[in-house]
């Protein structure tokens, strides 16, 4: 399986996990050659993800916007996620590790989740 196919398979597992856990309006940012221009008070920058951090967004059952960070076979770096949560009021983040390498996976890809608020 090439990287793009693995990413799509991981996204599918995360999407299924989100739906099973009653999240709604799930949207994943497509990874393309084109980047988005993000304008800030200090200038602008190019981003392939939402703020170069998130792979998607969804809504919780409580009506909160939840930012999604997905990785295959590793966890996302915590510092940028924790820094983002500190700056944004009412921010919720779900970080996913889709892997077959941890104990209990038995060679099958499984979804592991960390949350930040």
Residue ranges and their predicted role:
Residues 1-117:
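Catalytic phosphate/metal-binding cores of nucleic-acid and nucleotide-processing enzymes, i.e., regions
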